Structure formats: structure tokens, C-alpha cells
A protein has these predicted regions:
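CBM-like, beta-strand-rich accessory domains located in the C-terminal region of large
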Residues: 1-142
């Protein structure tokens, strides 16, 4: 398949991260994946439709997907094989979570938001459900 991809990343003043991925293909049966791998210390604590909440010992992470996409959360050995920090191969040492969003078609896009939070302070799920502002959407060219 003749396939092209583009990624735009926006970080706002409060440290929230928005990733917009676009993909174009000549074949409408093309499946495109957006993958994220989390550290072994993170564990899935809540899943509601398009919102995933992970927590570690001190911090947590909210992942929100705003474009209809299949979502698979896997826990275990990661593919592709990745080495961790230094010379340790984390794939052999500890299992991780891998989040995969996927879509099928010839003109696809993903809109994913991330928010790191301190567990002591709790989380604001309302933010997870809010669409990015028109200014952010314009900067991401969506």
C-alpha cells in the first residue's frame, strides 16, 4: 500500500499533551495503529469508553481518545521488542501495558490526549472528556 503518515503534538500550559495522527492510503482496507507503551510500574485501574486511567506508585496517567477507534489494552510482553533504559531488557524483566488504537480506511486520524497527575491530589475526569479547544484544534490542523 502507498501510505503516508503525519504526527502533530501539542503541549498546553498545564502539561497536558495532545497527539494528532493522520494517515492516508490508496487502499481503503488499510488498518492503521496508534500504539503507546507504558512503564512496568503503571497498571490499568479504570476504563470507560474512550478514557483509560493508569496508576503507578506516585503518579497516574489519563489517556483519552476522541476519534472513533478500536481500543485494545494488552498487558504482557511488548511487540516490537524494545530494550529499556541502560542495558536492561525490560521485556525480559517486567510486563508492561500497551495501548493500541486502530482504524481501517483510506483517510484516518486519531486525536489522543494525555494527562499525568499526582495520586495524592486525585484526578479530574471532567478534563478527560473535554474536547481540545478550537485554538488547539487549529494548531493541530484538524
Amino acid at each position: 500500500d502507498n501510505c503516508r503518515c503525519e504526527r502533530r503534538i501539542f503541549v498546553d500550559y498545564s502539561g497536558r499533551l495532545v497527539i494528532a495522527d493522520k494517515a492516508w492510503s490508496d487502499n481503503p482496507a488499510t488498518v492503521v495503529h496508534q500504539n503507546f507503551m507504558l512503564s512496568p510500574q503503571m497498571r490499568l485501574v479504570e476504563r470507560e469508553e474512550n478514557v483509560l486511567i493508569f496508576e503507578g506508585n506516585r503518579y497516574g496517567l489519563i489517556i483519552s481518545q476522541f476519534v472513533a477507534a478500536n481500543c485494545v489494552v494488552e498487558h504482557g510482553l511488548t511487540e516490537p521488542i524494545v530494550s529499556g533504559w541502560c542495558s536492561v531488557n525490560w521485556r525480559e524483566k517486567e510486563k508492561t501495558y500497551q495501548v493500541t488504537f486502530s482504524q481501517e480506511g483510506s483517510g484516518l486520524h486519531f486525536l489522543t490526549k494525555f494527562q499525568v497527575f499526582e495520586k495524592e491530589k486525585g484526578i479530574a475526569k471532567t478534563w478527560a472528556l473535554e474536547s481540545p479547544s478550537p485554538e488547539v484544534m487549529a494548531r493541530l490542523a484538524l
